[in-house]
Amino acid sequence: MEKTVESRWNASAEGSAGPGNFHKPVLLVETINWIEPSEEGFYLDGTVGGGGHSKLLLDSCKSCRIIAVDQDPQALEVAKTVLESYGDRVSFVHARFDQVLDEFPLEGPLSGAILDLGVSSHQLDKNERGFTFRKQATLDMRMDSTNSNLTTATQILNEAPEEELEQIFRDYGEEPRSRKLAHRIVTKRQKTPLLTSDDLVAVLYKTFKRAPTNREKARIFQALRITINDELGCLERGLERIRMDLGDGASFAVITYHSLEDRIVKRSFREWSKSCICPPKFPVCNCRGKALGSVPRSKGIRPSDLEIQENSRARSARLRVWRKA
């Protein structure tokens, strides 16, 4: 399979990032290698983005089919363009991956599933999306910008209680100065509201009493993004929901970009691979007594030095795979 995927990749790499280089897929060949596409396979790409992973998967088998899902309508439109030539082999769904299988009736069990978590290059590079700290961007950060029920970053920063802000930066940004930062934000908004990424970065300057590093800024923006989009809750629910629809022998490949995501994936895959899940105090096994599946590779797969050199945003990526029994 590896040679087949490598050769298919060479043929399709040019268009894998989508129109306007929407997003360069990370760990592309490695992910499809572990999925092991089959001719009659039925797959889920729960974060289709620019369509890179789905495109290579479809190129690796003549008749396999994919459900291409994304909560970002802009991403879905790009994926439709990239994957247009595959016709009815692709079904496009605008939804979150933790909800799609409840909304989209399956014809049968999934042969495999892919999740590529995190923010796409397109989302980072578009000022109006508000995900980046590098430009004077509006503080939005909603993955689905059409969903008016989602709170924006501007609303959280200007309306959330100080204690809630502290918790957000501590739990989701792992920021040791979360209390001081929350207090600074509340003090600032009493005078003028925080409306742009520059406004937030200016508060970081005052809090740290120096120029914050890009890594420090990224942690704070990450914390807000996770909160707004319920990313960790979505991941926990989505992993379990997708597992339930995997067929025997199906592979589940998940690419994470920070430790909070990776812990959840690692813990879930490990739990599903245990032969006994009874509480330690139980004298006799009272559960199913059989592992749901296995982790074919205990350590996460990192991008090669060459991939990182060509795509710096791949640096923090880690691929984990679970295979259903």
Give residue ranges: language-model regions:
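S-adenosyl-L-methionine-dependent methyltransferase catalytic core, i.e., the SAM/SAH-binding region
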Residues: 1-325
